[in-house]
Amino acid sequence: MTQHSRDTPQFYLTAPSPCPYLPGRQERKVFTHLVGDKATDLNDLLTHGGFRRSQSIAYRPACDQCRACVSVRVIANEFRPSRNFRKVLARNSDLVGEQRSAVPTSEQYSIFRSYLDQRHRHGGMADMTVLDYAMMVEDSHVETRIIEYRRRNLSNGPNARGGELIAVALTDVLSDGLSMVYSFFDPSETTRSLGTFMILDHIARARRQGLPYVYLGYWIEGSKKMDYKSRYLPQQRLAAAGWLRVDDEGHTAPEPQE
């Protein structure tokens, strides 16, 4: 094998399968492996081009005659929470987010298992075992972090570590932002809007770290599962001509070239 072939990623195309988001459609994906010394740089490059990471795989939809999946990233420094978002932040003011290395725990898996059983019992991840979960967290060749959201333990002071685990986010750190790979939460906490809260927290984290964007994955117009991503404005959506800006009023325009 030549040096060129080792350093050049090989891309593969999956066979058609039923689309999990739009009824009656078929999906295909193009994917490559994220391994080796250049995995971080490759992940950055591919994420900018609309790919997502799952373990050591980077993938992007490559469906015949369908372009419904649109990569979305929130412009962190310009984002201002709406009244409803501020209410979500207030409801979760008793939580503290603790960032740590991507190491799986039985405590995390317990929440993960409950979340799948209640929210996604018929989904593709429904049968994941504790070993599968460990692979999802640990099988990364890029900079990945776990953020655990716990009840604030006020008895030990305002700066104390949290108590009971409520929610978890698996997050990649990119050169220009945070990419939310997967997040889950205690499904019994029905009034907190924890999925929304974790996105808002990531936007705040990106801003504090001086990172421009929070990557949310794919927005799919007409899919109830994915429509929530359109609420975080201003944002950018990836089109054939590049990233397009969607402002607070929902108007779309090309971003100025740097």
UniProtKB/Swiss-Prot annotation:
Catalytic activity: N-terminal L-glutamyl-[protein] + L-leucyl-tRNA(Leu) = N-terminal L-leucyl-L-glutamyl-[protein] + tRNA(Leu) + H(+); N-terminal L-aspartyl-[protein] + L-leucyl-tRNA(Leu) = N-terminal L-leucyl-L-aspartyl-[protein] + tRNA(Leu) + H(+)
Keywords per UniProt: Acyltransferase, Cytoplasm, Transferase
Signal peptide range: none
Pfam families cross-referenced by the UniProt entry: ATE_C, ATE_N
UniProt source species: Bradyrhizobium sp. (strain BTAi1 / ATCC BAA-1182)
SUPFAM superfamilies according to UniProt: Acyl-CoA N-acyltransferases (Nat)
InterPro entries: Acyl_CoA_acyltransferase, Asp_Glu_LeuTrfase, N-end_Aminoacyl_Trfase, N-end_Aminoacyl_Trfase_C, N-end_Aminoacyl_Trfase_N
Localization: Cytoplasm
Keyword Acyltransferase annotated: yes
Keyword Repeat: no
Protein name stated in the entry: Aspartate/glutamate leucyltransferase
Membership in a protein family: Belongs to the R-transferase family. Bpt subfamily.
